[in-house]
């Protein structure tokens, strides 16, 4: 069966899922009203950093049509709505633009086209769309920044929200190419399943961070404890047991805010989500708390070096990044000169007072306090003993190969 797949909204999500569709053998039409994104993709350039994505775009380029003409979607058999839904500073979604976009799309696609909502929307959204229910679906995406294409190509399962009708043949043919269990349920169940996945992740991250801090305070070692937890079948080896700096990236925050609204509306456990958010914000302060302890001992310190600006390794996204959170905290004090290096971030438009170094070596030579804010693998190779100018290291991710003479320098890790 020959199918043409359309993607509307060339976000991180849309581009990776479109490339996955091409790898599975389908021709793909990619639409976005942003001419700069279309121009970039036509030149085989991805507007963000993601492992293997650009390489596979080049391999499958002949199967793509990139366009900002909405009518080019007319002959698609499946159309995925994959545009980012914007959020405010609290994580609340603004659905106005996505609703307008869908209204435009349903006016031009053919009547037998399958319309699939792929972006993050609250329960009840998909059912409200005016399109024949036997061709209207919600597909749960479980994209992970830094591993997005692999997740799109090899999902553990695919969760589909649908009406009571049988699964559409064309859509079913497309889904079976991914060779994983397909879980069918009603629209609201699928929409809530997406939120449920993230709330479980958030709860796990939050519990890990609390227990890790207790470990620090009582002299326990969280790494030893986490190894024991992974061997418990009720928890498992893939659980989020590495302590971190709160919830970042934007997607988890969005679902936490949706979850909070449901709790408030139903008047149940309203403080649960509020407390999670408080703990997350407190954890984002971890670097700053350690920093304040250090400058009490070394009042002459002026040079700060930050290794890593992205909110996690293998991405260039800085949304809700702990390092940016720290930069905001110290930027009011002109006493400090701040240098930063990240392998995928070359400039900070909103923080022009931060000097971006060309490499880690330049940064290390020009700092007295070193903060390891993102656990990039290349940072593990750094030998701190070469840099006598560094007095203290805040290394919350406990990069195990960080060579350091602990007698000469303080080395502050997380969870131990």
Predicted regions and their residues:
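Structural/interface elements that position substrates and couple domains in central-metabolism enzymes
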Residues: 1-416
